[in-house]
Swiss-Prot record:
The gene is Padi3. This is Protein-arginine deiminase type-3. It comes from Mus musculus (Mouse). It catalyses: L-arginyl-[protein] + H2O = L-citrullyl-[protein] + NH4(+). CDD domains: PAD_N. Disulfide bonds: none annotated. Disruption phenotype: No visible phenotype. The skin of 7-week-old null mice appeared normal, but scanning electron microscopy revealed structural alterations in the whiskers and hair coat morphology. Epidermis and hair follicles.
Amino acid sequence: MSLQRIVRVSLEHPTSAVCVAGVETIVDIYGAVPEGTDMFEVYGTPGVDIYVSPSMERSRERADTRRWCFNKGLEIIVIMNSPSNDLNDSHVQIAYHSSREHLPLAYAVLYLTCVDITLDCDMNCADRQDRSFVDKRQWVWGPDGYGAILLVNCDRDNVDSNAQDNCDQYVRCLQDLEDMSVMVLRTQGPEALFEDHRLILHTSSCDAERARVFHVCGPEDSCESYKCVLGPDRMSYEVPRLKGYEERFFVEGLSFPDAGFPGLISFHVTLLDDSNEDFSETPIFTDTAVFRVAPWIMTPSTLPPLEVYVCRVRNNTCFVEAVEELARKAGCKLTICPQAENRNDRWIQDEMELGYVQAPHKTLPVVFDSPRNGELQGFPYKRILGLDFGYVTREPKDSSVSGLDSFGNLEVSPPVVANGKEYPLGRILIGGNLPGSRGRRVTQVVRNFLHAQKVQPLVELFVDWLAVGHVDEFLSFVPAPDGKGFRLLLASPGACFRLFQEKQKWGHGRSLLFEGVIGDRRVQTVSINQILNNQSLINFNKFAQSCIDWNREVLKRELGLAEGDIIDIPQLFKTEKRKAVAFFPDLVNMLVLGKHLGIPKPFGPIINGRCCLEEKVRSLLEPLGLHCTFIDDFTPYHMLHGEVHCGTNVRREPFAFKWWHMVP
């Protein structure tokens, strides 16, 4: 609502004023007071509520029909709650009295015309328009909060277009309107009032760059009826009275929250008095509606899968077939990027992250395109952006990116509670270097974007010890039927050495790793005895374990985890240019499709006809109701320093929890 309006009355002639339903009007009686006045009466026609505040120290009281002492600091407050039928059809009369005179000294008359003006939108996030209980100038988080929500219209509903829907000032297809939020300007009052009063819809120059408003100026089933009235370089619009009582607008977001933009956008409608030809217009009333741009939200691996993505390259036919079978078991769609489009870039996890945006009226999947820009660079924009599938990207202006800017280094935890604070949408995990070091970090534009979304606060882990440098090289999350509903899997050199020592103790020291590997290059086998006698390998894995232990403590602290929430998965690393790479296929770098896990086949020592690494992993995960499928990724992925998770991507169901119910 606007602030109170002040109207001054005159003893020489009646005064006319416009008031807005439900908005207080202060009547200034000090400018025209007969000499000798020490009391006054004030009364009005039916429908006019009048209050008197005798002084700054006393609360207001109904004026009723009694006389009031004329004191310094008193106020007369007038409120009308229903719009007028005609101009000046209500009035307030003030009678000035002297205690020494029987009759009033003078009268002042204020004629009132009441209009009802509201800028309405979905304020309570329940898919209905309601303005009865909230301050539209505010946006409040939480289950009892309120505020309008705006989607960035970043999909491509028009099949004849090559651009996102919000890239121009036109509505190209009616389906595009489903991605927008409705804003309604309602006006009630005498039609004659608007002959010399104007309604202006306006916003700030900054907000005009972040949202676009379309006015419905004709039949709603015609794209030509939607006129762009606010947006870049358009900050104000005189609203014509096309439909009288109600004018409808559709609002689309142009920008996600980011550095310097917290996500709030305000629109205002102002009633201007243009009745005096000798003076400029004067504002009477302003109503405001505030929208928050919906954040981009990541989905953890514990949410149900909807669609799996994989690249077909020269030497991964069996891998693609295995992923296809796993997707079939999990009941989700499979999308294969052909070699002609990926040009042998198989790292589809690194190229993009699949998330969503949500408003009460619409949920929209949105792909976040990484700045790595390999041969898969065009795939998210050309093949995923489309009907009801949005797109966003962030790239540094100087084009300087590192391996940490690939999205294998971008994960999100399931919902957690840590240090007394709830994170109902989990926390984003990114990899970086140690505090104070000069190693690699995620580029600032990506960090700024992720931080600005607010609903999944960042946790930075230490990954600069890894050659590739991705968080998915040493951790993953799987669903669990008990406890927190998930387990954190951590790669563990210590667990692997303990397993091999146990097998050696039972006489299996000569059992070989890498037997049966088929590929373009011969892979030399190595025995358990050789591994346990390789002091250089042991020392390097002690270093790797210390790095993982550092991250373990960070994860326990920042995600509120106990040791019982963590499962150690046997894994060894080897050194390459002073950094770590997986010694055998990295078991935690898995594809999680509900209860079905696609795990890199480790080609571990065969004992009693079975791989002891596979058997150990099964013993850890199958009691949780999970089904382990070991996929041979050795030649097409492992030998290139990646695994199953690196070579796949998953679109998942959104959270059931609504982001606007949380308190960041």
